[in-house]
């Protein structure tokens, strides 16, 4: 069990190493942090910390750097979350207020999180709750193709192009009207049932073309938007420095895999709703992310939680990053709830 002085030394080492990227020596710690003990005493404390596995020394350097275990202790017992500044809070509110629909909210949120933290931000699409269909639009693109646009009460917009040879504007308008009369105000489950009944009632003349449209609408309704993850701030991977082949390239490749990102966020936020969680190094089960840290939180109503977070180097400013993730998660949750 480490006493308070050794915890103070570890905190000072983590703080200095994160800001300077250089190994930290005992003399510098005493001078910068007012530890009120001699460098010799600090060296003894550092020796204990190293023996316990909380710090190590790279190569022949006289300075020390934190290990993953050291960062873990720092996050769990030492770190104090830094509240966002008033300008940062105002910037979040202003940035979110301009959003026009759900897709825009997600894009703005993930970009904002990347900008605030200077890390790679990842965000799961909101989990659908009891949203209903607001409108269905059928747009003729050519003589043999149309665009189907489905707008939900949540603001989400799904669209898909379908081949529809031989259609005309009059029949398309009639089908659009009938489908909106059938679907508007229904939940996804209710809409699927209604569309299946709609198919049964089609006449022989309109059947084939309408069936093609309805089949596509059913496909759109079956898609779960919350299985999508949006990424922003990939250029921030330069924070890894020269570790391209060993760290950055595998992370870059993994960021392209939606299933991997969903698993990463899901495992990190499996605990209590609304809490900020931190996964450090090998605590991440996916190998490419074992050279990184993940700071994540949930957002949204308790019965439909989604996740967001940031990925960055293990040498991370945890207090600031955790505060930013918590603040953005709360803001986007409130913003979505207010509609």
Swiss-Prot record:
Keywords: Repressor, Stress response, Transcription, Transcription regulation. Pfam families: HrcA, HTH_DeoR. One of its GO terms (biological process) is negative regulation of DNA-templated transcription. The keyword Transcription regulation applies. GO terms for molecular function: DNA binding; DNA-binding transcription factor activity. Negative regulator of class I heat shock genes (grpE-dnaK-dnaJ and groELS operons). Prevents heat-shock induction of these operons. HAMAP family: HrcA (MF_00081). Belongs to the HrcA family. This is Heat-inducible transcription repressor HrcA.
